[in-house]
Swiss-Prot record:
A Pfam cross-reference name: AIRS
Protein name: Selenide, water dikinase
Catalytic activity: hydrogenselenide + ATP + H2O = selenophosphate + AMP + phosphate + 2 H(+)
Enzyme class: transferase
Species of origin: Nitratidesulfovibrio vulgaris (strain DSM 19637 / Miyazaki F)
Keywords recorded for this protein, A-Z: ATP-binding, Kinase, Magnesium, Metal-binding, Nucleotide-binding, Selenium, Selenocysteine, Transferase
Length: 350
């Protein structure tokens, strides 16, 4: 039997299928808030955070998130692991530890065999086991397009929360995974020459848990972090800069890039979601003369289960890189936090 190409069954792959940031911003702006329950919300929707932090009776707090998307790879087990790793990342990004999770399934039962879904769920279950989180249920609907993800609940110390609003001038920025998953996923979906190798590289990185980075946040009590996903490194930096009232400077020549990504981007294999990210951000971005247009595309590439971006003070750099090395995670220095630049520039690509 021929191999089923899951990516051919969907319009857009992975986090590139997200609603464009500008559209989402307009939609959410009209949602009302309920003042009667605001006192239980420690971190909510104000700064586009990775997850919510909610206060419970008795002094405990939980972190909650959900994430689901369409396939970015063809192997169903790999897709399940990637989707679970991506959902877990939001908990790690806040400084929490995953506790339990529930599956979210949209499945075309008339077009794909049940074995596909079984393998997807097995991949998700294995990722949760690695994270030490319990799978406690889920919900499924029949859909024209395959989608999978999880709702994750974690435990968190309310005194140790990393947020988008915690950047401070002088902080160094460390990234824990190379960039380019959106571009590789585009090549896989296009069945581009060499796409099997691209798919293996994609799985290798996108299935890695950001567990080690979460440990760094807790042990060093970091104030700012985010996982780099659908809005790209540039888009997430812009969110953090706006929430913190600072400017973020990214050193484009230092950006870690997955094998083959720059060549593919140079040929125009950039997902539509990445173009939307760049268009949404352009008013607050300054690109220095001489910066490669391809690296600008990489900076805004819509990542799926990307790395953690950690804001680390100069005196914490050695400790952060040591802790990451202990769990086998890279620590790529990609930029720094500056005082606000004139003209509303929140992101400098230099």
């Amino acid at each position: 039997m021929s191999r089923i190409r899951l990516v051919d069954s969907v319009k857009a792959a992975g986090u590139a299928a997200k609603v464009a940031p500008g559209d989402l911003e307009r939609i959410l702006a009209g949602l009302p808030r309920d003042p009667s329950v605001e006192d239980r919300v420690i971190v909510g929707t104000r700064h586009n955070e990775d997850a919510a932090v909610v206060r419970l009776p008795g002094g405990q707090s939980i972190v909650q998130t959900l994430d689901f998307f369409t396939p970015i790879v063809n192997d169903p087990y790999h897709f399940g692991r990637i989707a679970a790793a991506n959902a877990l990342s939001d908990v790690y990004a806040m400084g929490g530890e995953p506790w339990c999770a529930m599956n979210i399934v949209c499945f075309p039962v008339k077009r794909l065999p049940e074995s596909i879904l079984a393998d997807i769920l097995r991949g998700g279950s294995d990722a949760l086991r690695e994270a030490g989180a319990a799978l406690v249920g889920g919900h499924s609907v029949e859909d024209d397009e395959l989608k999978y993800g999880l709702s994750v609940t974690g435990l968190i110390d309310p005194e140790i929360i990393a947020s988008n609003a915690g950047l401070r001038p002088g902080d160094h920025l460390l990234l824990t995974k190379p960039l380019g998953t959106g571009i590789l996923a585009t090549a896989v979906k296009a069945n581009w020459p060499g796409c099997d190798a691209h798919e293996e590289e994609l799985f290798r990185w996108a299935s890695r848990l950001n567990k080690g980075a979460g440990r760094v946040i807790r042990e060093l009590r970091l104030k700012a972090a985010t996982d780099v996903t659908g809005f790209g490194l540039g888009g997430h930096c812009l969110e953090m800069a706006g929430a913190s009232g600072v400017t973020v400077a990214l050193d484009t020549a230092a950006l870690p890039v997955l094998p083959g990504v720059t060549e593919l981007a140079g040929m125009g294999l950039v997902p539509e979601g990445s173009h939307a990210n760049r268009a949404h951000c352009h008013k607050h971005v300054h690109v220095a003369p001489g910066v490669s247009p391809v690296l600008v595309d990489v900076a805004f590439d819509a990542q799926t289960s990307g790395g953690m971006l950690l804001a680390v003070s100069p005196d914490q750099m050695d400790a952060a890189t040591t802790l990451l090395a202990e769990t086998g995670d890279p620590a790529y220095p990609v930029g720094e936090v500056l005082k606000p630049l004139p003209g509303g520039v929140r992101l400098l690509l230099r």
